[in-house]
Curated annotation (Swiss-Prot):
Example GO BP: long-chain fatty acid metabolic process
Membrane topology: Single-pass membrane protein
InterPro entries per record: AMP-bd_C, AMP-bd_C_sf, AMP-binding_CS, AMP-dep_synth/lig_dom, ANL_N_sf
Residue numbers on the Extracellular membrane side: 1-13
Record: residues binding AMP: Y246, I247, Y248, T249, S250, G251, T252, T253, G254, L255, P256, K257
Species: Bos taurus (Bovine)
EC number: 6.2.1.15, 6.2.1.3, 6.2.1.-
Superkingdom, natural source: Eukaryota
Identification of the protein by name: Long-chain fatty acid transport protein 1
Matches recorded under PANTHER family: LONG-CHAIN FATTY ACID TRANSPORT PROTEIN, LONG-CHAIN FATTY ACID TRANSPORT PROTEIN 1
Keyword Cytoplasm in annotation: yes
Cytoplasmic side stretches: 35-646
UniProt cross-references to PROSITE patterns, sorted A to Z: AMP_BINDING
Length: 646
């Protein structure tokens, strides 16, 4: 930030001039001159440009910390905090189901969750037991996990897109004693019924066909109607540091892991979002994200449970209905994630775009290449982009609308929030260390792995990990900031500019080297998607026998078979460096995404450019001819043997 000697020299000159008998005003002016001349002007420039931002960020940090400590001392839980909201505004709308039109007041949500708590207590479920929820996003979903929490029972929130082995895996690792599933997912449960333990108690909620319920399944809704809606006579003795529920990671890099969400983490995520973007109690938030993930269930629904906002739920994102819903329900805040903003831009212009009242869009994953296009077309005044995995302790937020930034860390007071970018081996992603064995901090403009110092006594810095202890240990490094400390490894590469703004580069493993250069998959995906009219694109590196590094491969959604590889190549030559241009193309009906609209690359990377692994159309870039050629088994063999120079 500034030369280490600048400050020392200025202080020394101040003392020397004072000893010589000069007035303090003269001495101070001279010392300031030495400081500025020694490079301190850079620091003063940073102070002038970021002080307002940093003060606001500091106020948010202090406010959240004080609130958390107050709730910790009082041993409050999320259900108890919600109870206070209910008492203030029992008849206000809490949740609205945009699909069915159902509207739940805070009093109704409280009554439903009380019935859930009483029912499971009566059935013998004890604090610390786990119940899995497999249901699409609707008010009952929220009432279920909230009611279980009132009884001290921990919910495992299952991804509704999982089937068979992956679904059985997640259910098994949760240690659940019961499964509550929606009638709309009865067929998925039936598919794996043979893998479910006989001791697992099963409940079905919602509408279900005559063949949808198996003999050992109980209908939940009639049971709840017969159960008292009064608060539990003896609430569990839980606190903010106890487990609330489990959220499974999206599985973009393998099988999902069950992240532990304690009450304080739920509060922290919701509170940071609330204060960072100045949400108000009168706001109406539109939440079309999955409720089995943290963005929809904590950042979104948390505004309802903790701060009393009305939240409009839609079980599945619909680009064509998005703005109509916002107009219908007078939404002022919307959520996005992954590629949602790009999908909205692909839609034809609609009348509702100009009639909505949305002032704020909160989420993560908005590509810098479409940031301003999104705000200008839809008239959304503020983008609340943030960075943070469900389980991480190093979340950051873009509080002042800096285009493309995921958030910031203060350059003036960097130690107030102990996160850091550290150097890693670009090929193996191993941490690089100095002679003292500590991690090496990155300089401004230098990409590095984001890490957060762990302090289990501090709710803002604790890391609760996963159900799997081995998975937890893999995310922790030691002697990072100082000897013997522990830090959370985010797995994501970011870069920080001179003012402390951070920009997302790649998830570890998504940057690869080719021809001695680093290729950023995020950058190439953004370019390709823009050239192709916001089409879904997945970019990844593939190994080629006998060739150093990894070659760039792009999987492109081409459901109608209209894409011309060579017309695309003509455009790529204008905007991408030679080393970043895809060597291989795969044209397929659709690119797989996770439930949170993140591109799913695991299967694509595994299959590579081998035509035996797929029936999709494959092409390779013949550099001699200067265009793409079809890739069949014969060509594949020649490439692997080195007959074709890449």
């Amino acid at each position: 930030m500034r030369a280490p000697g600048a400050g020392s020299a200025s202080v020394a000159s101040l003392v020397l001039l004072w000893l010589l008998g000069l007035p303090w005003t003269w001495s101070t002016a001279a010392a300031l001159g030495v400081y500025v001349g020694g490079g301190g002007w850079r620091f003063l420039r940073i102070v002038c440009k970021t002080a307002r931002r940093d003060l606001f960020g500091l106020s948010v940090l202090i406010r959240v910390r004080l609130e958390l400590r107050r709730h910790q001392r009082a041993r409050h839980t999320i259900p108890q905090i919600f109870q206070a909201v209910v008492q203030r505004q029992p008849e206000r709308l809490a949740l609205v189901d945009a699909g069915s039109g159902a509207c739940w007041t805070f009093a109704q949500l409280d009554a439903y969750s009380n019935a859930v708590a009483n029912l499971f207590r009566r059935l013998g479920f004890a604090p610390g037991d786990v119940v899995a929820i497999f249901m699409e996003g609707r008010p009952e979903f929220v009432g279920l996990w909230l009611g279980l929490a009132k009884a001290g029972v921990e919910a495992a929130l299952l991804n509704v897109n999982l089937r068979r082995e992956p679904l059985a895996f997640c259910l098994g690792t949760s240690g659940a004693k019961a499964l509550v599933f929606g009638g709309e997912l009865a067929a998925a449960v039936a598919e794996m019924s043979g893998e479910l333990g006989k001791s697992l108690v099963k409940f079905c909620s919602g509408d279900v066909g005559p063949d949808g319920v198996f003999p050992d399944t109980q209908l939940l809704d009639p049971l709840l109607k017969e159960t008292s809606t009064a608060p539990l006579a003896q609430p569990p003795g839980k606190g903010m540091d106890d487990r609330l529920f489990y959220i499974y990671t999206s599985g973009t890099t393998g099988l999902p892991k069950a992240a532990i969400i304690v009450h304080s983490r739920y509060y922290r995520i919701a509170a940071f979002g609330h204060y960072s973007y100045s949400m108000q109690a009168a706001d109406v938030l539109y939440d079309c994200l999955p409720l089995y993930h943290s963005a929809g269930n904590i950042m979104g629904v948390g505004q309802c449970l903790i701060y009393g906002l009305t939240v409009v739920l839609r079980k599945k994102f619909s680009a064509s209905r998005f703005w109509d819903d916002c107009v219908k329900y007078n939404c002022t805040v919307v959520q996005y994630i992954g590629e949602i903003c790009r999908y909205l831009l692909k839609q034809p212009v609609r009348e509702a775009e100009g009639r909505h009242r949305v002032r704020l869009a909160v989420g993560n994953g908005l590509r810098p290449s479409i940031w301003e296009e999104f705000t200008e077309r839809f008239g959304v005044r503020q983008i609340g982009e943030f960075y943070g995995a469900t389980e991480c302790n190093c979340s950051i937020a873009n509080m002042d609308g800096k285009v493309g930034s995921r958030g910031f860390n203060s350059r003036i007071l960097p130690h107030v929030y102990p996160i850091r970018l550290v150097k890693v081996n670009e090929d193996t992603m191993e941490l690089l260390r100095d002679a003292q064995g500590l991690c090496i901090p990155c300089q401004t403009g230098e990409p590095g792995l984001l890490v957060g110092q762990i302090n289990q006594q501090d709710p803002l810095r604790r890391f609760d990990g996963y159900i799997s202890e081995s998975a937890t240990s893999k995310k922790i490094a030691h002697s990072v900031f100082r000897k013997g400390d522990s830090a959370y490894l985010s797995g994501d590469v970011l870069v920080m500019d001179e003012l402390g703004y951070m920009y997302f580069r790649d998830r570890s493993g998504d940057t690869f080297r080719w021809r001695g250069e680093n290729v950023s998959t995020t950058e190439v995906e953004g370019v390709l998607s823009r050239l192709l009219g916001q089409t879904d694109v997945a970019v990844y590196g593939v190994a080629v026998p006998g060739v150093e590094g990894k070659a760039c491969m792009a999987a492109i959604a081409d459901p109608h078979g209209r894409l011309s590889p060579n017309a695309l190549y003509e455009e790529l030559q204008k905007v991408l460096a030679p080393y970043a241009r895809p060597i291989f193309l795969r044209l397929l009906p659709q690119v797989d995404t996770t439930g949170t609209f993140k591109i799913q690359k695991t299967r694509l990377q595994h299959e590579g450019f081998d035509p035996r692994q797929t029936s999709d159309r494959l092409f390779f870039l013949d550099l001699k001819q200067g265009h793409y050629l079809p890739l069949d088994q014969g060509v594949y063999t020649r490439i692997c043997s080195g007959a074709f120079a890449l």
